């Protein structure tokens, strides 16, 4: 008989321990089945832990005794201390945690020893009782009735010491949410941020709409789409890269203030800031321009910081961002000059000098690029990462802004802005191009770029041109990356930390 490899034995030991634990729990479940319904659904919870803490944490022992507050609560048992005839147990629900005080004498005869003490951490239980304060002044529930509602067959991660394997947190988010308070708080805060954005726009008479995820022509952004096929229509289709063109069709139709919070898809790389499937908000307002939207964005983000985070000062790692101060505003050229030494304004005015500047800063450019694209690439490589405090960058070249309105004083640039914090782009907005002939010409330029090998160039959308020919009122629109905004406001340094189910490579079998 061959000896077992030590490494193999080390790998098998935890699995064997897990198998033993699950076998014990399965036996307990079988015993529950023999006694009746093992998964009851007749317990009704009436209270949530965080609400109880908010209402009664400041009460004294005497006040709680006088109030005699009866509660009904349910959640997952996370900790338990058995002390003879009495036990303390901590349960976790959607609001947080609260302690139960369970005594043998308050329960049916033999229940404490034959039932309660045999339950396991991770089991979901329901309890009723009266609030009181312990000797250490902790708000707790003196239990008069307790039941097991769901038997957990698998143990909690590392016996409740937490789930520290980052990849496991992403692959098994349900375990991460059970074991890690910070993850729970991040996603609860994400929900509050999205609700705050929605409420802000609702209060200003914006209408929330839904537009198709499947499109026959992807548009609204420069990105490579995911391709699919519609069998019933025998039609190649794409997952949308942005909802922009459909939202502007709605403005043509008379819905003058619209927004959508939903997913978009771009078949591009994965990084700490990029996920192929991501959430964004786009909103459009008729009879407004890009300056109006800069003002709205500044006010909205300041409001979210103050009302959701409780402060206009946002801490991100070792950086501090001030959303209470006026946001910085400057043109792309101004920012390149301000944040880079040794560059003269004249160097940004011709193709020859821009190419020389790109070579000096080791910025890679392509021969078919125009001045605007080269300038934008120089900005992105030399300046963007230096925009730390909340900053609007304006005057984007028309060459890189195929859907934006040209500036009246300088038609080579557009009435467009991008918003940066911590060196990262969070938003992109502009006065919309509503000249159908100009838009058709820019679409043709995009088609030429696509034919020359640019996978991210836009398609020609004839129906959108037809919509513009019916008349799009003067309009401004904007898109904000929800995931990146949540990263900033929750001090999260990878996008996977703010996505409940981030994309992962399949595990090797």
From Swiss-Prot:
Cofactor list: Mg(2+)
Highest taxon of source: Bacteria
Main location: cytoplasm
Protein's name in the database: Lysine--tRNA ligase
Pfam families cross-referenced by the UniProt entry: tRNA-synt_2 (PF00152), tRNA_anti-codon (PF01336)
UniProt xrefs under Gene3D superfamilies: Bira Bifunctional Protein, Domain 2, Nucleic acid-binding proteins
Subunit structure, as described in the record: Homodimer.
Family statement: Belongs to the class-II aminoacyl-tRNA synthetase family.
NCBIfam families: lysS_bact (TIGR00499), PRK00484.1 (NF001756)
Catalytic activity: tRNA(Lys) + L-lysine + ATP = L-lysyl-tRNA(Lys) + AMP + diphosphate
Keyword Transmembrane: no
Record's subcellular location: Cytoplasm
UniProt-listed InterPro entries: Aa-tRNA-synt_II, aa-tRNA-synth_II, aa-tRNA-synth_II/BPL/LPL, Lys-tRNA-ligase_II, Lys-tRNA-ligase_II_N, Lys-tRNA-synth_II_C, NA-bd_OB-fold, NA-bd_OB_tRNA
UniProt cofactor note: Binds 3 Mg(2+) ions per subunit.
Extent of Polar residues compositional bias: 1-18
Record's GO cellular component terms: cytosol
EC number: 6.1.1.6
PROSITE patterns: AA_TRNA_LIGASE_II (PS50862)
Gene: lysS
Binding-site list for Mg(2+) 2: 425
Entry annotated with the keyword Aminoacyl-tRNA synthetase: yes
Region of interest: Disordered: 1-20
UniProt binding sites for Mg(2+) 1: 418, 425
GO biological process per UniProt: lysyl-tRNA aminoacylation
Key words of the record: Aminoacyl-tRNA synthetase, ATP-binding, Cytoplasm, Ligase, Magnesium, Metal-binding, Nucleotide-binding, Protein biosynthesis
UniProt GO MF annotations: ATP binding; lysine-tRNA ligase activity; magnesium ion binding; tRNA binding
């Amino acid at each position: 008989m061959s000896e077992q490899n030590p490494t193999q034995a080390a790998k098998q030991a935890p699995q064997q321990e897990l198998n033993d634990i699950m076998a014990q729990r399965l036996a307990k479940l079988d015993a529950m089945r023999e006694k009746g319904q093992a998964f009851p659904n007749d317990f009704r919870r009436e209270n949530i832990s965080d609400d109880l803490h908010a209402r009664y944490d400041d009460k004294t022992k005497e006040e709680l005794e006088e109030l005699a507050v009866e509660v009904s609560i349910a959640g997952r048992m996370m900790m338990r201390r058995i002390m003879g005839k009495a036990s303390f147990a901590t349960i976790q629900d959607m609001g947080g945690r609260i302690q139960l005080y369970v005594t043998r004498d308050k329960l049916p005869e033999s229940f404490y020893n034959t039932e309660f003490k045999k339950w396991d951490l991770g089991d979901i239980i329901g309890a009723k009782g009266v609030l009181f304060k312990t000797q250490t002044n902790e708000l707790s529930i003196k239990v008069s009735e307790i039941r097991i509602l769901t038997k957990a067959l698998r143990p909690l991660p590392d016996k409740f010491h937490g789930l520290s394997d980052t990849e496991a947190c992403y692959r098994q988010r349900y375990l991460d949410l059970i074991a890690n308070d910070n993850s729970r708080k991040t996603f609860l805060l994400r929900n509050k941020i999205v609700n705050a954005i929605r409420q802000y726009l609702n209060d200003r008479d914006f209408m929330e709409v839904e537009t198709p995820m499947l499109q026959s022509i992807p548009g609204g952004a420069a990105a490579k789409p995911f391709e699919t096929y519609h069998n019933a229509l025998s039609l190649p289709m794409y997952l949308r890269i942005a909802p922009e063109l459909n939202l502007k069709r709605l403005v043509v139709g008379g819905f003058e203030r619209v927004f959508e919070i939903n997913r978009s898809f771009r078949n591009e790389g994965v990084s700490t800031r990029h996920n192929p499937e991501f959430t964004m908000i786009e909103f459009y307002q008729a009879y407004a321009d890009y300056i109006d939207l800069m003002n709205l964005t500044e006010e909205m983000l300041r409001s979210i910081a103050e009302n959701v985070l409780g402060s206009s000062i946002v801490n991100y790692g070792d950086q501090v961002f001030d959303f209470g101060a006026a946001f910085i505003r400057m043109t792309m050229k101004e920012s390149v000059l301000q944040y880079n030494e040794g560059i003269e304004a004249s160097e940004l005015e011709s193709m020859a000098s821009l190419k020389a500047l790109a070579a000096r800063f080791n910025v890679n450019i392509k021969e078919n690029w125009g001045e605007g694209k080269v300038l934008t690439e120089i900005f992105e490589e030399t300046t963007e990462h230096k925009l730390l405090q909340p900053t609007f960058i304006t005057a984007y070249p028309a060459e890189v802004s195929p859907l934006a309105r040209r500036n009246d004083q300088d038609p080579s640039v557009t009435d467009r802005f991008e918003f940066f914090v911590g060196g990262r782009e969070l938003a992109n907005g502009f006065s919309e191009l509503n000249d159908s002939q100009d838009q058709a010409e820019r679409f043709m330029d995009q088609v030429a770029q696509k034919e020359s090998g640019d996978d991210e160039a836009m398609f020609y959308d004839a129906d959108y041109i037809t919509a513009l020919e019916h008349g799009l009122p003067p309009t401004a629109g904007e898109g904000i990356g929800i995931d990146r905004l949540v990263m900033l406001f929750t001090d999260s340094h990878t996008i996977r930390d703010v996505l409940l189910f981030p994309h992962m490579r399949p595990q090797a079998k």
